[in-house]
Amino acid sequence: MTNIRKTHPLMKILNDAFIDLPTPPNISSWWNFGSLLGLCLIMQILTGLFLAMHYTPDTSTAFSSVAHICRDVNYGWFIRYLHANGASMFFICLYAHIGRGLYYGSYMFQETWNIGVLLLLAVMATAFVGYVLPWGQMSFWGATVITNLLSAIPYIGTTLVEWIWGGFSVDKATLTRFFAFHFILPFIITALAAVHLLFLHETGSNNPTGIPSNMDMIPFHPYYTIKDILGALLLILTLLALTLFTPDLLGDPDNYTPANPLSTPAHIKPEWYFLFAYAILRSIPNKLGGVLALLLSILVLIFIPMLQTSKQRSMMFRPFSQLLFWTLIADLLTLTWIGGQPVEHPYIIVGQLASILYFLLILVLMPTAGLIENKLLKW
């Protein structure tokens, strides 16, 4: 008798995706982040659902409802901080996942990569609208500053901003629609993630060497299920440590002050995972130029498959490209640090240099290194 998991229409899909999936035998722990992102997404949807049961998306009660969740709801404080720090874990996994893709040339699976970029944008949008919901000072001013960037669009800018606000400033209408977006987007992300997996399973996984491994594959279960469980346990352990010992480590103290349109915080800054893009935005003294640089800092990922000049897919055997890759990581860390600093000397010039280097590395230096490495190998 044939096993039910191979015949039942639903079980067959799960079987082909998580059990009998042929997988390269040499993929490292850098390939764990995909499953960890799935875990983060499930966790965020569940904690978010329980928070939504007690939260009220109204300017007069939003801040109080969050305080009520933390004080009066059973384990409400735990759910709230799991959700807030879960977002940070989500972005750590996301950036590691993208970094892995860049290093090992996974972007050569173009459909998978492009849907991945869409996923990144959707997660960033979700995190942004979610940060507005507690209606603290940083929520309000963050929403005001970022939505205001759209006014830089010629001709339709101002109308567009007022349309998004639902009025002439960030107010009740804005909060209500942001709550609606924050609720619906994770389900759109789930659907996109399923399509992301669908395209990945059309080609099979890449591996550290970048060489096709079709002739040497192993089943996903038990080898990689056990490996993913280990990764999941480490993720949960880290998240619990963060949530139970230092829940406010990554947050902003200003968000414990209720939103006040009449008082601007000394330093308006987003959550840590947006600081690199915020630094690029601030490094250009022109509003429209800054907005375009901000957009391009993320959308540049779409062009990466077109910028592949090397005849080798992975960076595993390419020392020049490796050096530039780690320079890019250091540059992104520098931008993240600059994004959290006030706009004054020497931070301004450091931010401008780091922004120039970011685009220079991706668009010029890395493709050039690929060509040089081809020459050195006489290819």
From Swiss-Prot:
**Key words, A-Z:** Electron transport, Heme, Iron, Membrane, Metal-binding, Mitochondrion, Mitochondrion inner membrane, Respiratory chain, Transmembrane, Transmembrane helix, Transport, Ubiquinone
In its miscellaneous comment, the UniProt entry states: Heme 1 (or BL or b562) is low-potential and absorbs at about 562 nm, and heme 2 (or BH or b566) is high-potential and absorbs at about 566 nm.
Which metal ions or organic cofactors does this protein require, according to UniProt? heme b
Q: Which InterPro entries match?
A: Cyt_b/b6_C, Cyt_b/b6_C_sf, Cyt_b/b6_N, Cytb/b6-like_sf, Cytochrome_b, Cytochrome_b_C_euk/bac, Cytochrome_b_N_euk/bac, Di-haem_cyt_TM
For the ligand (a ubiquinone), the binding residues are H201
Cofactor descriptive note: Binds 2 heme b groups non-covalently.
- Organism of origin: Tursiops aduncus (Indo-pacific bottle-nosed dolphin)
Give any single GO term for biological process: mitochondrial electron transport, ubiquinol to cytochrome c
* PROSITE patterns per the UniProt record, alphabetical: CYTB_CTER, CYTB_NTER
Q: Which residues take part in binding heme b b562?
A: H83, H182
Query: Where located?
Result: Mitochondrion inner membrane
Membrane topology according to the record: Multi-pass membrane protein
Q: Which residues cross the membrane?
A: 33-53, 77-98, 113-133, 178-198, 226-246, 288-308, 320-340, 347-367
Instruction: Give one GO term, molecular function aspect.
Output: metal ion binding
- Pfam families in the record, alphabetically? Cytochrom_B_C, Cytochrome_B
| Functional note | Component of the ubiquinol-cytochrome c reductase complex (complex III or cytochrome b-c1 complex) that is part of the mitochondrial respiratory chain. The b-c1 complex mediates electron transfer from ubiquinol to cytochrome c. Contributes to the generation of a proton gradient across the mitochondrial membrane that is then used for ATP synthesis.
UniProt lists the gene as MT-CYB
Q: Name one GO cellular component term.
A: mitochondrial inner membrane
Give the family per the record: Belongs to the cytochrome b family.
Impact reported for T257I: In strain: Isolate South Africa
Q: Does the keyword Iron-sulfur apply?
A: no
Coiled-coil ranges per UniProt:
none
How it assembles, according to the record, is: The cytochrome bc1 complex contains 11 subunits: 3 respiratory subunits (MT-CYB, CYC1 and UQCRFS1), 2 core proteins (UQCRC1 and UQCRC2) and 6 low-molecular weight proteins (UQCRH/QCR6, UQCRB/QCR7, UQCRQ/QCR8, UQCR10/QCR9, UQCR11/QCR10 and a cleavage product of UQCRFS1). This cytochrome bc1 complex then forms a dimer.
Instruction: From the Swiss-Prot or TrEMBL record, give the protein name.
Output: Cytochrome b
